[in-house]
Amino acid sequence: MNALQRDLKKLVPLVESLGAEKAAADPHRQRFHLQPPVGWLNDPNGLCVYGGQYHAFFQYGPFDVNGGVKHWGHAVSTDLLHWEQLPVMLYPDEPFDCHGAYSGSALVEDGTMYLYYTGNVKHPGNFDYIKEGRGHNVCLAVSKDGVTLDSKQCLLTNRDYPAGLTCHVRDPKVFAYEGRYYMVLGARTLEDKGEVLVLESTDKLRWTHINTLTTPEPFGYMWECPDLFCLDGQWYLAVSPQGIDCQNVYGCGWFAIHGDWRRDCTLSEFHELDAGFDYYAPQSFVDGNGRRIQIGWMGMPDADYGNAPTVAYGWQHCFTVPRVLTTGPDGTLLQNPVPELDAQRSAAALHAASGEEVFLAPRFDLTAAPAGDFCLTVAQGVQLVYTEQDCTCTLRFTDPALADGRTVRRARLAAPCRSLRVVGDNSSLEIFLNGGATVFSTRYYPAPGDVSVKLTGAACELCNL
């Protein structure tokens, strides 16, 4: 242990203990979403199963509610809904990660947890920090108990990446496949084109670039947080592209891969994962039941809206409810809350007729089977309006007090809406349409106490969570 890590190990728990009471007093503190003890949270990292528990790491700024230097926060759960915070796993305490232990992934093998992450280094000087002045290193931390580190090392630096790239190469996702190990890295070229590098290894340490995944025409200048996975025999690439034309500052979605991603392949058209205000940098993993589970950051970088109500209590952001990924008949990715959420539903369901306003705790689960136009209103200031004629769904804040700058988001459904599910927590709404084919995620900030819910155009069932 070096001196910096020794001191950070003392300082972070102190900061957390000093801010814990204030954060806990926030009425907008979430009940079943992973959130930081204090400070800032963004990307999910290192999602895995280890020792009979789910492990989730997260980009964590304990010293700054608006970001700051990034650590890897750490939490465990047995049901994906109730999380126990553990001590920070990765500190920015080495020359190769001194400006932040940035995003990455976990590989669990033979009782050992391998954490691959981006070591961020910003060199002093008059640099643009895009084409020069920054180091994005692929680093490896190893743990034999899932809690403490046995080693950290730098595996790759910018000199090891292919020619023609900027300094921005990051977010390693590592997995085993057909007797070898593979890594995908998000990258930005010198021509400002986003792409994903595919690397191969036989020993988890030495890596060789074997392919690059991209589109024929530029699609954004940077592809962040790549995730490469197979469902029902079809391979998918999920990325968070920056610089595309979309409703949010940055996009988030998936391509279907046609061909062998290790050699020669093409990408399908891009499909948005979430049409809401707050969804970015999702990652997925396979659990012990063979389910592919995806978790996203319920936030958005560089957005012109915020979370001032929680910032006032010394914390900001959370993860989404974990979602099981499946495929539809046409290969479309479907997202639905993990079934563990069903066990949290109250035994007594409330049945509301069309147009009937009900009041209940903000932690609720609503289901409905609409057959035409409908309008859902939550807390008398958040509306979801569906128009059957053009299969368009609009999420709109009509009360600025709930929004902290959020306004309107829209999505066109591929088919008429015949199922609606809304999962509410103390300061979030996650909306699943047509069995998870279209999803909206947003934070919102209702007054303390019960919230009103009214669905016009269909009857609905509501349960407390």
Q: What role is predicted for each listed range?
A:
Residues 221-226, 279-282:
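Repeated scaffold domains used in trafficking and secretory/extracellular systems
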Residues 15-20, 256-465:
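Beta-rich accessory regions
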Residues 1-171, 176-219, 230-275, 298-347, ...:
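Beta-rich carbohydrate-recognition and catalytic domains
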